[in-house]
Swiss-Prot record:
A zinc finger (C4-type) spans 27-49. Binds 1 zinc ion per subunit. It is found in: Cytoplasm. Belongs to the AccD/PCCB family. Pfam families: Carboxyl_trans (PF01039), Zn_ribbon_ACC (PF17848). SUPFAM superfamilies: ClpP/crotonase. Keywords: ATP-binding, Cytoplasm, Fatty acid biosynthesis, Fatty acid metabolism, Lipid biosynthesis, Lipid metabolism, Metal-binding, Nucleotide-binding, Transferase, Zinc, Zinc-finger. GO terms for cellular component: acetyl-CoA carboxylase complex. InterPro entries: AcCoA_carboxyl_beta, Acetyl_CoA_COase_Trfase_b_su, ClpP/crotonase-like_dom_sf, COA_CT_N, Znf-ACC. This is Acetyl-coenzyme A carboxylase carboxyl transferase subunit beta. It comes from Chlorobaculum parvum (strain DSM 263 / NCIMB 8327) (Chlorobium vibrioforme subsp. thiosulfatophilum). Zn(2+) binds at C27, C30, C46, C49. The lineage of its organism: Bacteria, Pseudomonadati, Chlorobiota, Chlorobiia, Chlorobiales. It comes from the Bacteria.
Length: 279
């Protein structure tokens, strides 16, 4: 026997709809919740505070080259293991695992295309592959990008996004600092423009070599740029560091960076600079 009868029908429930993974991102600077489409429309910068998210080489290629069209070269190069290095895992295993998880083959990609109707070469680093560290393959790719620039008589853009040298390759990694720097002198000998774009982060052996050798050294806003990290420096000198130390704005104020350019202005600014440098 039913003692109580529901007078009003119960609220109907529907199956829970899962929000697609990766649809929303949180700004690291201001905490704003940003939709994927919103980020794409703003070239992965926060519309609220201007924070620049780290992006991969193919995204730089897509908005810097005319019509988002480019041709990649030297993508087949792979890291060797000259030291048979082992930390928590063998170096070849770490590279293989990173390739499988990220879908990337190395911490640097090279591409040719046109910018403003003229040929250009871009070599871009990727922090998502072992911290964007520079090993022998990255050094070789950057050197070949310089060679391609000479071959095409086209301006070169190097986009840095790296924690520094790749410790798993030891001295072979450090040698890339001299190798890339020497190769870039060929552009200066032929009056071919070379612009270095520093993004967050540009650290260690990268900042101590080619990242600071451009005809113009430009940066995205608030990029971390330096050799050793702030904590290491503070612990060494036993003093507090100035506000904003090693950020792009601080370096520009002290003459180490020529220009800070928002990502939305980057393409047109680079085209303008190339025309100026070409005379």
């Amino acid at each position: 026997m039913v003692w109580f009868k529901r007078g009003i029908p119960s609220i109907k429930t529907t199956d829970k709809r899962d929000t697609p993974e990766g649809l929303w991102s949180k700004c690291d600077e201001c905490g704003a919740a940003l939709h994927k489409k919103q980020l794409e429309d703003h070239l992965y910068t926060c519309p609220e505070c201007g924070h620049h998210f780290r992006i991969s080489p193919d995204l730089y290629f897509s908005f810097l080259f005319d019509d988002g069209a480019w041709d990649e070269f030297d993508g087949q190069l792979r890291a060797a293991d000259p030291l048979t290095f082992v930390d928590t895992k063998k170096y070849p295993d770490r590279v293989r695992d990173t390739m499988q998880k990220s879908g990337k083959s190395e911490a640097c990609r090279n591409a040719t295309g046109s910018m403003g109707g003229s040929a250009a070469v871009i070599s871009a680093m990727d922090f998502g592959f072992i911290g964007g560290s520079m090993g022998s393959v990255v050094g070789e790719k950057i050197s070949r990008a310089a060679d391609k620039s000479v071959e095409l008589n086209a301006p070169l853009i190097l986009i840095s996004q790296s924690g520094g040298a790749r410790m798993m390759e030891g001295a072979f990694s450090l040698m890339q600092m001299a190798k890339t720097s020497a190769r870039l002198t060929r552009l200066g000998e032929r009056n071919i423009p070379f612009i270095s774009l520093m993004t967050d982060p540009t650290m260690g052996g990268i900042s101590a070599s080619y990242a600071m050798l451009g005809d113009l050294n430009i940066s995205e806003p608030k990029a971390l740029i330096g050799f050793a990290g702030p904590r290491v420096i503070r612990d060494t000198i036993k003093r507090d560091l100035p506000e904003g130390f090693q950020r792009a704005e601080f370096l520009k104020e002290h003459g180490f960076v020529d220009m800070i350019v928002h990502r939305k202005d980057l393409r047109l600014q680079l085209i303008k600079l190339f025309k100026h440098l070409r005379g």
